[in-house]
Amino acid sequence: MIKYITYDDIDKSKWDSCIRSSVNGMIYAYSWYLDIACSKWDGLVEDDYKSVMPLPRGEKYGFLYTYQPPFSQQHGVFSTSKITNEKVKEFLKGIPAKYKYVELSLNTFNRPTEDSFETSEGVTHLLDLISPYDTLQ
């Protein structure tokens, strides 16, 4: 089950452990990096930090919104298990309605198929270092 958790209630050691163990872990999702890149952030958490999704938070004219912080190329769902389109859709639908505007750059493992979200594709160059060196050559 996916739960919305405010910054003060996030267990940062479990959060960082999830990022470290996830198939698609990136520096941009570690709690210490989020603390530097954005002044406020909350998160969506599945079960006991099996999967997480950071929600950088801003407020303008009394409206809450989530955004892509500077120097953070990719966010989205990070998981210790396989990331399916269904899981990404569940996380996106789990963003609370109090966020009136959402603009996030999802990571390369997140492929939303839900028509109710407006999406655009960008180009990135990513070398997956999970493969052995001989394969990467």
Label for each model-derived stretch:
Residues 1-27:
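Short amphipathic alpha-helix that is part of the acyltransferase structural core
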Residues 1-6, 10, 114-137:
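Acyltransferase donor/substrate-recognition loop-hinge adjacent to the catalytic core
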Residues 17, 32-90:
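Conserved donor-binding loop and adjoining core beta-sheet/short helix segment
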Residues 21-22, 39-40, 98:
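Structured helix-beta-strand junction loops
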Residues 25-34, 103-107:
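A short, aromatic/hydrophobic, helix- or strand-capping loop or linear motif
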Residues 58-61, 108-111, 132:
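Short, solvent-exposed loop/turn segments at secondary-structure junctions
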Residues 84-124:
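Non-catalytic accessory segments adjacent to catalytic cores
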